[in-house]
Amino acid sequence: MPTPSPVTYPLGGPVIANNQITVDLALNQPALITRRISDLTLQKFIAPLIFTSSGQAVTGGAVRYQQATANELYTSRDIEQRGPTDEYPTVTADRLDEKLAKVEDWGGKFPISDEARKRNNVTELNRNTTALSNTIVRKVNTRTIAALDAAITALGGAGTFVGKNWSTAVTNGVSPTANNALPQSDFAKAQLLADQDELGVTYNLWIVNPQEAANLATTYGPALQALLDYYKIELFSSNRVTAGTAYVAERGAVGFLDYEEGLTTESWREPGKKTSWVQSYVLPVFGVTNPYSVRKVTGLAG
């Protein structure tokens, strides 16, 4: 029988203690594998950093939602000074078009031979579970970045700016890089653009490629954390982000993330091949409701 995770996204919380499970026990209780995958993936997802649950129950394979626009900032008609016996004008905000986010279904399976089961080959089980976990993370993160790119592209350039070259920044020596050409100037510029939008967005998360994370560490060394604290931002690196680019966002404000089914694991035996199968899957649905709460930064590698 399928065994869904009782915990919310990303995939549930770690429960296994000291990895003391047998292959036979795991195959008989697939929930243990679900929890193991949750343990391995807990800190690796981009989606929970920028999306939050809408609180809606997901039915019918899709979720309807509205996406914020710049026209929401002010009413379509200006307010007026009222004279004696006059009425104030009727003011409204523009009505937003509805969008539809479809539920996605991602999963995979792997075999465990009867021999591995009898001999309690925990190494084989762990190797396959880890590989499946990494693949789930890669797929969900790839889809998350694709959703961000689609929303940013729809803004027609308003959601992108060219940053400084982080790979050549120097903070000391005889020829230090000017302050307005250092990586920290991109932190300041991102928030400046958000303030100019007047939509109340505070950028507090930078999602970067490991290359850019390494360049920051090289440039600032032990002072990096103090710099991030000063700008009140958190750094998260992922190989799903193209090298030389970054995404700056307000944590939890970009959109919604729900799921028709959380991470589920099931197992069954195929007698003809003397093999047991382990299958795990997750059915997420997400959408960008506020594209102005995220920006793409390019040119970070020159």
Model regions and ranges:
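N-terminal short leaders/motifs
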Residues: 47-67, 184-196, 230-236
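Sequence/fold signature of self-assembling virion shell proteins
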Residues: 2-26, 62, 214-302
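Structural beta-strand/beta-sheet cores of well-ordered domains, especially the beta-sheet scaffolds
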Residues: 108, 201-204, 231, 274-276
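Long, contiguous amphipathic alpha-helices that act as assembly "spine/axial" helices in icosahedral shell
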Residues: 93-156, 271-284, 288
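Extended, solvent-exposed, turn-rich assembly/linker loops in the middle of proteins
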Residues: 154-230
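Charged, low-complexity, helix/coiled-coil-prone segments
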Residues: 27, 63-82, 114-130
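Short, Φ-rich (hydrophobic/aromatic) sequence segments
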Residues: 24-49, 188-190, 247, 252-263
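Assembly/oligomerization interface modules of large self-assembling protein complexes
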Residues: 33-106
